[in-house]
A protein has these predicted regions:
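Active-site rim/loop-helix segments in enzyme catalytic domains that contact anionic ligands
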Residues: 1-93, 121-122, 209-216, 222-233
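The feature marks non-catalytic terminal segments
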Residues: 134-235
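Alpha-helical elements of Rossmann-like donor-binding domains used by nucleotide-donor carbohydrate transfer enzymes
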Residues: 19-20, 52-55, 80-84, 111, ...
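Structural signal for conserved beta-strand scaffold positions within catalytic alpha/beta enzyme cores
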Residues: 36, 66-69, 128, 142-144, ...
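Flexible loop residues that form catalytic
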Residues: 40, 70, 102, 131, ...
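Active-site adenylate/phosphate-handling loop in enzymes that bind or generate adenylated species
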Residues: 88-133
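Divalent metal-coordination and catalytic microenvironments
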Residues: 11, 38, 53, 65, ...
Length: 235
């Protein structure tokens, strides 16, 4: 499977789906591609941030990292932005694309989200990730990262130049993952989750979904059931 992760700034991809990418890269049949549109010059030295981004891609085990030269904080939904994203979509031939949420508060993120939807019109699956400061986010997909949450924190720590930002601290990363795990109500053994919004989701023939066995119903519950249950069966 080819996976393309798109981000506006160094550390966006890692915050949004770093755990998923770490797990995917450990499996031989997954190819990770990363496309970053700016070098983050509005929040630090762009050369230093570029070096951090390269170290991050190596840590993840990405097959390719592409770094563009759009100006930080100046992105807008335009044909130029759409064309650039479409070029790297065609270059990576992804089965799934991860990008920013259309409801994000940062205008760079919103521009990329909209451009990805247009550029990815022939991509079967597009999911939008969140970062700890994303607000209007309504997840429908949850991915278990319990076994790599420490690795994700180590990944985020690569961005040393941004260490002063509270949402990059380990308690913010772990706290969001724990909150999404509780929200998903999967299973008490799952302690860390990355959540995603669905922009496009195409199921193939296998239609494999994660399932946990339901808890057994106690006998006392049956005392509260009605005396007669009529079950309708189609003929």
């Amino acid at each position: 499977m080819n996976i393309l992760a798109i981000g506006a700034h160094p550390d966006d991809i890692e915050l949004g789906c770093g755990g998923l990418l770490l797990k995917a890269s450990r499996q031989d049949h997954h190819n990770i591609f990363m496309y970053n549109l700016t070098r983050g010059g509005a929040s630090g030295d762009p050369e230093e941030r570029t070096k951090e981004l390269i170290r991050s891609a190596k840590f993840i085990g990405a097959k390719s990292l592409w770094i563009d030269n759009f100006q930080d904080t100046k992105l807008s939904l335009s044909s130029d932005l759409i064309n650039h994203i479409e070029f790297f979509i065609k270059k990576s031939d992804p089965d799934i694309v991860f990008t920013h949420s259309i409801g994000d508060t940062h205008h760079d993120h919103r521009a990329i989200a909209g451009a990805t939807i247009e550029a990815g019109r022939y991509v079967p699956n597009i999911l939008a990730y969140e970062i700890p400061v994303t607000r209007d986010f309504k997840p429908q997909v949850y991915y278990d990262i319990s076994d790599v949450i420490d690795g994700k924190i180590e990944l985020i720590n690569i961005f040393w130049s941004q260490r002063g930002k509270s949402f990059l601290k380990s308690n913010a990363i772990r706290g969001l993952a724990q909150y999404r795990a509780l929200q998903s109500r999967f299973n008490h053994t799952i302690t860390g989750v990355e959540a995603f919004e669905v922009q496009k989701l195409f199921f193939g023939k296998e239609f494999k979904l994660l399932k946990f066995p339901q808890e057994k119903i106690s006998n006392s519950m049956f005392e509260e059931m009605p005396n007669e249950i009529i079950e309708s069966k189609s003929t």
